Amino acid sequence: MASEQEILSGLAEIVNEETGLPTDSVLADKSFTDDLDIDSLSMMTIVVNAEEKFSVRIPDEDVKNLRTVGDAVAYISQAQG
């Protein structure tokens, strides 16, 4: 099971691969849409990659609740058990 810091680092790498944003700009308090300018298609790619990386399932209906990077970190941490 990954720590929240490891999850944050992993998500930053995934966001970097998808968008080209520097990993150090992907912080827990950043909004995916407002701060990082990630559209819904890119968000779905990020979710799929996060599911694979962290061995979790994030149902489509839960994705809309992941507004910030921190929301995603908390969700993945909880989903890992």
UniProtKB/Swiss-Prot annotation:
List of residues that carry O-(pantetheine 4'-phosphoryl)serine: S40
Any one of the GO BP annotations: lipid A biosynthetic process
Predominant place of localization: cytoplasm
Keyword set, alphabetical order: Cytoplasm, Fatty acid biosynthesis, Fatty acid metabolism, Lipid biosynthesis, Lipid metabolism, Phosphopantetheine, Phosphoprotein
Record GO terms (molecular function): acyl binding; acyl carrier activity
Compartment(s) of residence: Cytoplasm
InterPro entries noted in UniProt: ACP (IPR003231), ACP-like_sf (IPR036736), PP-bd_ACP (IPR009081)
Record-linked Gene3D superfamilies: ACP-like (1.10.1200.10)
Post-translational modification comment from the UniProt entry: 4'-phosphopantetheine is transferred from CoA to a specific serine of apo-ACP by AcpS. This modification is essential for activity because fatty acids are bound in thioester linkage to the sulfhydryl of the prosthetic group.
Superkingdom to which the source organism belongs: Bacteria
Pathway the protein acts in: Lipid metabolism; fatty acid biosynthesis
A GO CC term attached to the entry: membrane
Pfam families: PP-binding
Domain (Carrier) ranges: 2-80
PROSITE patterns on file: CARRIER
NCBIfam families for the chain: PRK00982.1-1 (NF002147), PRK00982.1-2 (NF002148), PRK00982.1-4 (NF002150)
Role: Carrier of the growing fatty acid chain in fatty acid biosynthesis.
PANTHER family referenced in this protein's UniProt entry, alphabetically: ACYL CARRIER PROTEIN (PTHR20863), CARRIER DOMAIN-CONTAINING PROTEIN (PTHR20863:SF76)
Protein family according to the UniProt entry: Belongs to the acyl carrier protein (ACP) family.
The protein, known as: Acyl carrier protein
Origin species: Kineococcus radiotolerans (strain ATCC BAA-149 / DSM 14245 / SRS30216)
Lineage of the species this protein comes from: Bacteria, Bacillati, Actinomycetota, Actinomycetes, Kineosporiales
